């Protein structure tokens, strides 16, 4: 039997180390930035994807971690955290992921005054949907 992308898609999978703030849809980043008045390095989806992608030569750890500044900038409200958690769960489900361990640092989402408990509750609510 030849292993095809369709077969792989149907196989049950486990995602054991998934960073919430590294799993946003490009369209969602742009929409949340518009809603929240956040300035992005580009409003064009193709350009933003290039900016956020690692590519073949990842560069330094500092370069890699710096990309999270962009996603974190739009994850400072309960609504945005709930939305991206929900979208992550949906995307994983569509990819055949049946077990998902999501990680994030709640304190990185408190820059605009959100409480730590709000960050946790929002992510839990999004994942539970």
Protein language model regions, located:
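Metal-cofactor-binding active-site regions of metalloenzymes
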Residues: 1-129
